[in-house]
Amino acid sequence: MREAMQLVPMVVEQSSRGERSFDIYSRLLRERIIFLNGEVNDAVSALVCAQLLFLEAESPKKPIQLYINSPGGVVTSGFAMYDTMRYIRAPVHTLCMGTARSMGSFLLMAGEAGERTALPNASILVHQPSGGFQGQASDMLIHAEEIRRTKHRMTRLYAEHCGRTYEEFERAMDRDRFMTAEEALEWGLIDRIITEREIGAERDA
């Protein structure tokens, strides 16, 4: 992630006040576009949540575009972003470019109903949460119970957002389940597959 940030290009704009330069992500933020690129962790979650809150404060009804290319990561960090997406008034439109795995797919399906999209060659993965821990047997049992509760919560939310039954997603998440964009559409994780930027998205941005 650090190496990627070092390669971020700068955009130079001319105005009556002179010349200003922005990194490309800051420039896209002005168009209400947020990138979730890379692993989901506390630092990335804090950044995305802050951008969501900032854009809502600027315009509480104007859509926000969340572009996702993520292998997933920390469950609690993902839940923080999920809850913030639901908390703000501005609708969040999600788009998968590349891959949305684990918590990446969870955030993809959490977008505004009817506005969850993927590019044609996107790859989506759903699976149950996992965790590794050491310690006394009693502590391990406590952690195992917490993972069980987290799995139940995630399965319920997947089912609610995707219009499927709890049992269907429980079976789907029992093992790693990779999906093409077409399969994700069939499962209700996304609402449509797009091949080029839509006119409405350009107008909203």
Swiss-Prot record:
Keywords: Cytoplasm, Hydrolase, Protease, Serine protease. It comes from the Bacteria. Signal peptide: none annotated. This is ATP-dependent Clp protease proteolytic subunit 1. Its main location: cytoplasm. NCBIfam families: PRK00277.1 (NF001368), PRK12553.1 (NF009205). CDD domains: S14_ClpP_2. SUPFAM superfamilies: ClpP/crotonase. It is found in: Cytoplasm. The keyword RNA-binding does not apply. The keyword rRNA-binding does not apply. The active site is at S102 (nucleophile), H127. GO terms for cellular component: cytoplasm; endopeptidase Clp complex. HAMAP family: ClpP. It catalyses: Hydrolysis of proteins to small peptides in the presence of ATP and magnesium. alpha-casein is the usual test substrate. In the absence of ATP, only oligopeptides shorter than five residues are hydrolyzed (such as succinyl-Leu-Tyr-|-NHMec, and Leu-Tyr-Leu-|-Tyr-Trp, in which cleavage of the -Tyr-|-Leu- and -Tyr-|-Trp bonds also occurs). GO terms for biological process: protein quality control for misfolded or incompletely synthesized proteins. Belongs to the peptidase S14 family. It comes from Rhizobium meliloti (strain 1021).
